[in-house]
Amino acid sequence: MPSVMKCGYLATAGLIGICIHLWYFRYGEHHLYPWRYVRFHLCLTMGVSALLYAKKPPQYTLSPGDLVKDTCLLMVTYLIGLFTSLLLYRTLFHPLRQIRGPWAAKVSSFWLSFRLRRGPSFRILHELHEEYGPVVRVGPSEVSIIHPEAIGIIYGPNSRCSKNAFYDNGHPMMSLHSYRDRTAHDQRRRVWSAGFGDRALRGYEQRMRVYRQKLFQRLEERADAESTINISQWFNFYSYDTMGDLAFARSFDMLDASRNHWAVDMLMHGMIGYRYLFPSWFFRLLATMPSLSNDWHKFIGFATDTMLRRLREQVGVPDIFASLLAPLNGRDPTDDERNMLMGDAMLIITAGSDTTATSLTSIVYELARRPDEVDKLRAEIEPIEADSDGEYQHDTLAKLPHLNGFINEAFRLHSPIPGVIPRKTPPEGIHVKDIFIPGNMTVFSPQWSMGRSEAAYVDPAIFNPERWYKHIDLVKEKSVFAPFSIGPYSCIGKPLAMMNIRTTVARLIMRFDVRFPEGEDGIRWMDAADEHFAMGIHQMPVVLTRRH
């Protein structure tokens, strides 16, 4: 092929790459079906090869090797044009170009994913904020903000922000958590709300007490043996057994077996990908590769079978799923409804189990460090009469200021969702103080950093439960405190979680003295906490001693 012709083809290929970026990929969302783009470019490659062969001058012989070489050269030139345009746009012309942050973060979202090999997002983001200030560009279109005003603007009741592409990672499986359309979300939330009224919560409490009894039996056995207990593991067993029952009317039996159910192991392995905050298109690409997502799909298969069994069962004491099944009026669900029920069941298990276990573990960590606070809690709880099983009525615990203050302090410093809860800015953009964030950008405000912000709290490094009821001036911006998020997308399970946490903590401190093993202070285990959207504290060794 003549060199002049080849140069013309190369210039055209590069120009096409530039145009595709500027006129297609710059606009809208393209994450739902990533394999379509893979197939498109494979077809494009074959089309280019066929075109080169058809257009070759008659006097030239084009060997298969030359055809492959010329095709690859044109495709590489096309990609160079596309990515050069992308690079120049993101670094020089992007609407976020004035926001400070690492240079590589401007170029690719994979920069943050790569950085997360060093640790969980909440710690990495905290380091970035210490270096760059309260507003940091952490990706081409992603901004982390820790100004106190940001919480209300991004997540609050009157926020104009919506959910971004992250919430499509499980598509077509849907859940209350993943609805991006506000109207559809509100409609589904009304269905869920029927399962979280006072009457429903009292029913769930009956079911939860069964597993709490088992938990304390196991803890007492180990306390009598004077052995070190990984309290995090036992809270995990308890939480998954409880939420499995509430989701499917069927426990995972982890407290009985004293080990993880195989399906829970599959779930934990399958959730690892969430730690790295991959772009949604890449996450969905990986999720279709059996070698990388086999564990996740095994859990989905188990959960699907269990859900279908639950559809055919009648339960005496209603579970959460009973409220979700009510709109069906006894008929079989459609495919879309089945995907929705499957997603909601997964949400009950993952959101309810991980966050509760982490919250209880972080509270025990603080209890073991602060015996003076334990004395205050016992003095507050002792006037309340427990039943024969050692259980307390939640209504009485809910009114105790120091117990609530202690739990709030643990949430402030160890939020169960400590890092990225992404939102998409409205087309007109948002203002946070004197910073303008343009429309259709991803923003978030990590709770782990907000809980340590001197702009929101006086002496934020000091653990002081009284800041929540006695010295309220120590909380400068109460709206910043959002362990369950706030606004229309806030956690609907907060009343259930708080009931579970209060009753478990009260019984624990009245039944046991809690301390760390000799030579331990728990700090290294908190520093080793992982994250896959929710925080995970895998180890927290303590020694429990019966009080009486």
From Swiss-Prot:
Binding residue positions for heme: 491
Any Pfam family the entry gives: p450
Residue ranges of the TM segments: 5-25, 35-54, 73-93
Disulfide pairings: none
GO MF annotations in UniProt: heme binding; iron ion binding; monooxygenase activity; oxidoreductase activity, acting on paired donors, with incorporation or reduction of molecular oxygen
Reactions accelerated catalytically: tryprostatin B + reduced [NADPH--hemoprotein reductase] + O2 = 6-hydroxytryprostatin B + oxidized [NADPH--hemoprotein reductase] + H2O + H(+)
Coiled-coil portions: none
Enzyme class, broadest EC rank: oxidoreductase
Keyword Metal-binding recorded: yes
Required co-factors: heme
Membrane topology: Multi-pass membrane protein
Main location: membrane
EC number: 1.14.14.118
Pathway, per record: Mycotoxin biosynthesis
UniProt similarity note: Belongs to the cytochrome P450 family.
Protein name per the record: Tryprostatin B 6-hydroxylase
Organism: Neosartorya fischeri (strain ATCC 1020 / DSM 3700 / CBS 544.65 / FGSC A1164 / JCM 1740 / NRRL 181 / WB 181)
Underlying gene: ftmP450-1
